[in-house]
């Protein structure tokens, strides 16, 4: 994890079969679910299993939701992620609150990010 002037960046491995694809994601504790670009869902070969109503900076919208296998901070887990077009944005993935619960990560923006030692 890296703290930049504007956000916290996290290296996340996304798995398709056994080969991981690693991306730099933006940690977004205000997002209930992770969010990935459509191009990543195509690369991973995942299909939507439901839709969700999402509130974003662009207003309310419905988005497709997929299951993805991710790993960061040494823990691999399966989480839901919404699909969106992230062209022109810095990060192809937002790491939402749903990915933090199993990861034992504490975020204190004023000071640092702490991961529990195993």
Annotate each language-model stretch with its function:
Residues 1-118:
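Pepsin/retropepsin-fold aspartyl endopeptidases
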């Amino acid at each position: 994890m890296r703290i930049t002037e504007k956000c916290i960046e996290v290296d996340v491995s996304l798995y398709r079969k056994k080969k991981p694809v690693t991306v730099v994601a933006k940690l977004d504790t205000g997002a209930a679910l992770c969010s990935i670009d459509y191009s990543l869902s195509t690369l991973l070969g995942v299909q939507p299993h439901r839709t969700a109503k999402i509130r974003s900076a662009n207003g309310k919208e419905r988005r497709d939701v997929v299951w993805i296998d991710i790993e960061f901070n040494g823990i691999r887990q399966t989480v839901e992620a919404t699909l969106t077009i992230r062209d022109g944005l810095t990060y192809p993935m937002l790491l939402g609150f749903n990915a933090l619960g199993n990861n034992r990560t504490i975020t204190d923006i004023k000071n640092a990010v702490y991961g529990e030692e195993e």
